[in-house]
């Protein structure tokens, strides 16, 4: 037996990735594994239940509402040519059973099924730092997921920073595609500085970057910083009108097509969506933190699916 030492490694590890691969750093960090010094999750999921559902209503379209679908889609193990037929059958059986258990619980939160994928429940195990990256216009993994893990790292007393860009479900730099200058710096340079500090002890000040760095929606060349995600201020917007509104899924009546979907569903009311507009603000207001909407709804039949999307009417 010959002992092989990994002399190329100092034993310190970082994790990064986007979407499913951005979720894995959260999952590993909340195990408290030794050697994981920092993570840079991009559009990662903090809680699988709230990613797929919204308080008992389905958030995703039917096929992709199942965790097993995404687990299968993102599993590189199926491409392993050395797998035996028995191993493939066991993996398929596992994903099938996962689907059955999820369907059994419906759209309500079931701790037995969803608890393992609710990483914020294990904030006390976190031992590493985090630089969390999230798109504010990501309609796949919402900002709620970023917020939950940001608070989890704070609860654990670990250094956590955030970069919030105006993009969708993207990494701020994509090979051969595009890149976003993050406050005048290349994204890759920022990540290099962060990881170099935590893995190699480079004194570059990366750990002292702003708590929150956010790209402005009114001018995407501008970035602003904040000391925290939320503020001590609260603003309540109420509606004096009362009544009952009924919406349905009659696409033809709404005149919805692939070309006009955003206009019909996002900027005006129809039989498929209702738009509520506040009075114009008398001065510029920056919403910092979480937007909460309280409403009551009943589902007559069909899929229990609902969604809410706050929009700046000046942008619409």
Regions found by a protein language model. Name each.
Residues 1-14, 19:
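Gly/Ser-rich "nucleophile elbow"/oxyanion-hole loop immediately N-terminal to the catalytic nucleophile
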Residues 139-146:
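Conserved alpha/beta-hydrolase "acid-adjacent" motif
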Residues 153-172:
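Catalytic histidine neighborhood in serine/cysteine hydrolases
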Residues 27-125, 203:
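Accessory cap/linker subdomain of secreted extracellular hydrolases
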Residues 17-27, 140:
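Glycine-rich nucleophile elbow surrounding the catalytic serine of serine-hydrolase chemistry
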Residues 126, 132-134, 138:
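Short beta-strand/loop motif that positions the catalytic acidic residue
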Residues 179-316:
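C-terminal, loop-rich substrate-recognition/catalytic regions characterized by aromatic stacking residues
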